[in-house]
Amino acid sequence: CYLLDEARLRRNGEILLGVQQRTSCKILLAQKAFSNFDLYPLLAPCLAGTEASGLYESRLGKEELPEKENHVFCAAYRVDEFNELLDYADHIVFNSPAQLAKFGPAAKAAGKSVGLRINPERSTQEGHAIYDPCAPGSRLGTTRAQWDAALAKQPGLAALLDGLHFHTLCEQDADALAVTLDAVEEKFGDLLPGLKWLNFGGGHHITRPGYDLATLEACIARMQEKYGVQVYLEPGEAWALNAGYLVTTVLDTLQNGDTSLAILDMSAACHTPDVIEMPYRPPLLDAGEPGEKPCTCLLYTSDA
């Protein structure tokens, strides 16, 4: 079963609320990372709104937190869903100039705040380029060259924009954000004056012990004061970091040659899909690295 630690969730929320109070930034809940809406009331006093990755997350945010801001980003929107999305979202971010041209006018006509996801082309990650939004050939975000080429053909695109959005981090500290902001200013700084907001995206491990809050807050202040924009952040994991547990049972133990194995009463595909997709090793209570403890054991789930 899953266990959620309400005290830890509340503490995470308090940390994020403190950042907002000290800097006047706004922090959203990225629902793709945590969408247990039974606990939204607990987090509600600490968040400015929700971030959705599509129609149904946006609807969830609207239904559960109707008084909060509702932001959405999707790599590509569906024509048959977009009108319904306008009923829920108040901030809509597009991934490409083509999507901005296709849906931006309708979003503006409906009174929505419109943004473009940018790619600052400055990677701060190593070892998993397939998930790095700044990796060569990335599908996520618009490079400056792509923007300039689109604007040359459709000069009216710039008038649709209220803000810019980037999301380049993954479980990282504020030093990576500072590096990213240098690239954002270098590539897109001339677009920021006159815009209303700048969204720093997610991947900020703000509630992790030892996270550099001072550098984060300096980064926020730097952009708000220099460009007069409202800064948003949309962490997901930071809201629920270290506040959830998967509790399972050992059903059987095996010995195959020199290898010790344990079969668990759980499904990797259903309960911990990141283990398969990433790959990812979740922290295990009282466990260590291979050879560190008296027994080294491979854990397997009971599904075939």
Predicted regions and their residues:
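Feature marks short, surface-exposed loop/turn motifs that line or immediately flank catalytic pockets
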Residues: 122-124, 170, 206, 239, ...
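Conserved small/polar residues in nucleotide/adenosyl-binding loops
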Residues: 300-304
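Active-site loop ensemble at the mouth of alpha/beta enzyme cores that anchors a bound cofactor
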Residues: 128-134, 210-224, 228-288
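Active-site-proximal beta-alpha core segment in soluble small-molecule metabolic enzymes
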Residues: 25-197, 219-222, 263
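Glycine-rich beta-strand-to-loop/alpha-helix junction loops that act as flexible
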Residues: 168-169, 198-207, 235-237
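A structural motif shared across PLP-dependent enzymes of the aminotransferase-like
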Residues: 5-8
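A short, N-terminal amphipathic alpha-helix
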Residues: 12-20
